[in-house]
């Protein structure tokens, strides 16, 4: 099945009794306009978005009378970092950026992929954190630069 545009968002179908056939992708795949994968139920999907937009968790790619095909990211081990002050946020953001570690800020939390070497760094900064499993909902926005 060829998909050239997003037809909606899963939140718009909360009251619907349509079945959702998830197309599970890697976090990095959200930045891609062209992608080929199979849904959980085995439907072959070829995505070739016409515009230059990105995919997002919950995007509905296809709708029939009884089924939706929607995007979701894989469940990943993450550190949920919870700065309590602006100083903690600044220190942690500096350290994460200095390592070129991808992160997402959601509400008052910083989410980074699990990496055992980060534990020591987070402990040194003194910020509270926990290990958890989450799905990244936003594509990482790359900002290219040179040193």
Curated annotation (Swiss-Prot):
Its cofactor is Zn(2+); Ni(2+). InterPro entries: UreE, UreE_C_dom, UreE_N, UreE_N_sf. One of its GO terms (molecular function) is nickel cation binding. The keyword Metal-binding applies. Pfam families: UreE_C, UreE_N. Ni(2+) binds at residue 100. CDD domains: UreE. Belongs to the UreE family. Involved in urease metallocenter assembly. Binds nickel. Probably functions as a nickel donor during metallocenter assembly. This is Urease accessory protein UreE.
């Amino acid at each position: 099945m060829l998909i050239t545009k997003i037809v909606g968002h899963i939140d718009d179908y909360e009251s619907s009794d349509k079945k959702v056939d998830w197309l599970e992708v890697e976090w990095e795949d959200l930045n891609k306009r062209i992608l080929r994968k199979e849904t959980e139920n085995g439907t072959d999907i070829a995505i070739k978005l016409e515009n230059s937009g990105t995919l997002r968790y919950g995007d509905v790619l296809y709708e029939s009378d009884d089924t939706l095909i929607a995007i979701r990211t894989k469940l990943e081990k993450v550190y949920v970092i919870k700065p309590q002050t602006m100083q903690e946020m600044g220190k942690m953001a500096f350290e994460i950026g200095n390592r070129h570690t991808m992160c997402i800020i959601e509400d008052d939390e910083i989410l980074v992929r699990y990496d055992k070497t980060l534990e020591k760094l987070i402990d040194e900064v003194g910020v509270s954190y926990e290990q958890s499993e989450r799905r990244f909902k936003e594509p990482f926005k790359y900002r290219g630069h040179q040193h």
